């Protein structure tokens, strides 16, 4: 009886041993799979982090303003207000204009004016001109600004903050309807497209400049430049238009806003 009982005990021991070995094998496979998965995930993550960012899109609209440092052939090196440099290229098709000193006799019927009012001028009222910028119309029409005319706009300050300084008078622009003595009548268009009439008075303190057509010979070191065009793949501006003006004490100051000339 005792010999026959020993056989089943040995059989049960063998079954338990096989089951244990199978469990250990499955556990090892699971660990191997997890390790492989972790390795794959780490590799993917590393690849994502080290991928390079795309370069800037060429042919994007751009502008460059600053002091002309040098001119070589059809390429201009410009020193910007922040002392960074920029390359501007031009061709025979580039429109070039230059602001030159002018006077009241240059203000004629049909010419286009951009007027900076003196301090204290009220919106919608006759203004006294501190500066007058003159340009010729194109097909009988004065060009529209690229952006809003400076001045006149103010934002509401946060509650409890000090009262802001009064907004500077907005620049006035339009076509000269008539000139009589020291009075200029301008016809313009407001933001809603409605026709406006503005009376502008000038005095002996009013300063005048006139935008005249220029050629490539006018592009010279020491002048201020404002150019518009598109950037090429190398980052240079391919200029479609260039505006020039004289520097003041070798400086150009901050880039002029649309409506301020230059």
UniProtKB/Swiss-Prot annotation:
Q: What is this protein called?
A: 27 kDa lipoprotein antigen
Q: Which residues form the signal peptide?
A: 1-28
Alphabetically list the UniProt keywords. Answer: Cell membrane, Lipoprotein, Membrane, Palmitate, Signal
Task: Give membrane topology per the record.
Answer: Lipid-anchor
The entry's cellular-component GO terms read: plasma membrane
Query: N-palmitoyl cysteine: lipidated where?
Result: 29
The compartments listed are: Cell membrane
Statement: the UniProt record of this protein carries the keyword Cell membrane: yes
